[in-house]
Amino acid sequence: MRTQMRIRLSVMMFLEYFIWGVWYVTLGTWLGEQLHFSGQQIGFAAGTTAVGAMLSPFLAGLLADEFFATQNLLAALHGIGGVLLWYASTRKEFGIFYAVLLLYSLCYMPTMALTNSLSFRHMRDPRQEFGSIRVLGTAGWIVAGLIIGFLHVEPTAIPMRLAAGSSVLMAIYCLTLPNTPPLGSASELKLKHIFPAESVSLFKDKAFSVFAAASFLICIPLQFYYAFTNPYLNEIGVQNAAGKMTMGQMSELLFMLAIPWFFRKLGVKRTLMLGMLAWVLRYAAFAYGNNGALVWLLYFGIVVHGICYDFFFVTGQIYVDRKAPPALRAAAQGLITFITYGAGMFIGSWLSGKVVDMYVKSSTLGIVAHTWRSIWLVPAAGSAVVLILFALGFRDNEARFSTSRSTQAAPASE
């Protein structure tokens, strides 16, 4: 891949994840402190991206493959999304805010798959080249958090408006990207185009079924972290919470490099279990940490994000890639994404909000406080149950396998 093309794709990835990272992390803090939304309302708002993740395979797959050039579709989605996000930042009524944010998520979430597919189309060797491009997305998320923390604007609408402006900028930039026309011919939208019936046959394999069930279940407590970590840290007085939370993405980059070694030493099952164990330890650390002598527990809970994500989700992506026949790999990955980031996190958004509302203390002067230890022990217990069930139920003959092909293209979490 030529240097010029590498730079163009890297800028695209940086902007793609800067947009998401600049508003999503601090959303709960703004909604809770300034708009006084309930925990359940905050959870539902954070869960709009899960709805987008469930529907994005239809939008991203068929529209780009059959009807529109990818760069033009990206420009349209980001342009419309920027307008919607700005409008959402001006609303104070939950009903209207939620509806607009949901529409925005339906525009944004497909763009992650579209930026990946556009990159693949312009690479000579995607397996070797994609990783070095995709890492700029994580860098964009990190820079977004550092900027918001530095500006001290977490409990305001500024992060969302900055994301809206960045989205419009991204729309303009997408029009400069290399032409990526559709490869197929127009056809009607059908579920079988996205999830072929053959992909369901993977569930006949007991090990795959257990893995899929565990992936779904672990994503339910996952939403506690994404929706309520920033409000939690701000409520207990941690300064520059958004900036400090970027340590999680920094550790993610480091632990990504360690995955091949752990595969060789532990195999797939124990690597997956280590990832789930990290979730248990993280939530326990949040439950018992504080902004005083035990502040190190909070930092531990943030830094362990690299293990939480890489050792379960990236490992899981590689496992699916190895289990599925070549013709079904894309469909299988889409199915797992639907199960995890779609259905699992959608349920998690509802449950996390309900739990947070259960442990609201009496408010004074309009300031709402929470019994955070009780809140964090719920996802800790849930993650522990999933870990135990997975340990007892997962049996796979392919205990160890090479990661040379799959780790290059595994997307990083934010």
Model-assigned labels for residue ranges:
Residues 72-86, 270-285:
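Structural signature of the two symmetry-related core transmembrane helices
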Residues 1-3, 178-213:
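Juxtamembrane intracellular "pre-TM" segments in multi-pass secondary transporters
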Residues 55-69, 151-153, 254-268, 356-357:
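Helix-to-loop junctions at the C-terminal end of transmembrane segments
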Residues 14, 84, 94-114, 118, ...:
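Hydrophobic core of transmembrane alpha-helices in multi-pass small-molecule transporters
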Residues 37-48, 128-133, 138, 158-161, ...:
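Loop-to-transmembrane helix entry
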Residues 88-90, 169-179, 375-414:
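Multi-pass alpha-helical transporter architecture, strongest
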Residues 2-50, 207-245, 313, 349:
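Helix-loop boundary and gating motifs at the non-cytosolic
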Residues 150-166, 354-383:
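A membrane-interface helix-boundary motif in multi-pass transporters
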